């Protein structure tokens, strides 16, 4: 008898691929410890259909370009960071990397994949420039060791700088439609708030936001800045006022996931 069998085990994920992912989604492993390729094209059957429905993002996972990093230090209590750049002109960047209304990456517990190596991050910050380019600074959970720093050095030297979050799943599953819903809510809210901010009430007071978000922790409201790009005029509108600056110069908006 030369046949061999191996069993599949379920394990709760400790990281997320999308902003709207539920905590502890299952991933599959072979019982002998080997990785199970959930994206294999030969998987087939009900299992592949289930995974595509759960993880399908219409091949719209996040992608941007690595520009620099800091290694951090446990002794100095400094965090490691990875910086990415995204713009419409860069073909390596996904549409949702240079458009806040489409952004769908986890606030924390996400994984950056750079040159076939994964880095887990704790939070990130985005700076948007007047030319429409985005700069992401990801704060990693742990300082980088010598091997990880060397890997990033090699990636930068060889031009292997494409950095992704989540898998490319060519199916319109739950993550795709959740992202579509988020984009609609953000765009609608921003446009309505922009109209509110440019007007005045009956007491001649400047209008304020109609749509706001309240964190569950303390009940306070987020301060939402409406960032809308007008292609005709070539500038951003921030809270109803045009933000015009030299290309690549002025930062008109900064957002943090913390």
Residue ranges and their predicted role:
Residues 1-258:
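Structural signature of extracellular appendage/secretion-system components
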């Amino acid at each position: 008898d030369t046949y061999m069998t191996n069993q599949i085990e379920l394990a709760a994920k400790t990281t997320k691929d999308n902003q709207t992912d539920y905590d502890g989604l299952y991933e599959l492993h072979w019982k002998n410890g080997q990785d199970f390729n959930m994206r294999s094209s030969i998987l087939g059957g009900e299992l592949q259909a289930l995974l595509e429905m759960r993880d399908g993002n219409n091949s719209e996972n996040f992608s941007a370009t690595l520009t620099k990093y800091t290694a951090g230090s446990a002794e100095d209590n400094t965090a490691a960071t990875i910086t990415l750049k995204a713009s419409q002109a860069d073909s390596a960047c996904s549409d949702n990397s240079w458009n806040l209304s489409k952004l769908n990456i986890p606030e924390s517990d996400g994984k950056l994949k750079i040159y076939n190596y994964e880095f887990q991050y704790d939070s990130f910050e985005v700076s948007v420039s007047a030319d429409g380019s985005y700069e992401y600074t990801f704060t990693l959970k742990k300082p980088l060791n010598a091997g990880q720093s060397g890997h990033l050095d090699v990636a930068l030297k060889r031009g292997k700088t494409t950095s992704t979050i989540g898998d490319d799943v060519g199916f319109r599953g739950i993550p795709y439609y959740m992202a579509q819903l988020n984009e609609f809510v953000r765009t609608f809210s921003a446009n309505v708030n922009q109209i509110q901010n440019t007007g005045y009430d009956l007491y001649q007071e400047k209008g304020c936001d109609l749509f706001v978000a309240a964190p569950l922790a303390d009940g306070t409201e987020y301060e939402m800045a409406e960032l809308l790009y007008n292609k005709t005029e070539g500038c951003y509108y921030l809270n109803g006022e045009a933000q015009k600056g030299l290309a690549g110069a002025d930062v008109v908006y900064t957002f943090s996931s913390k």
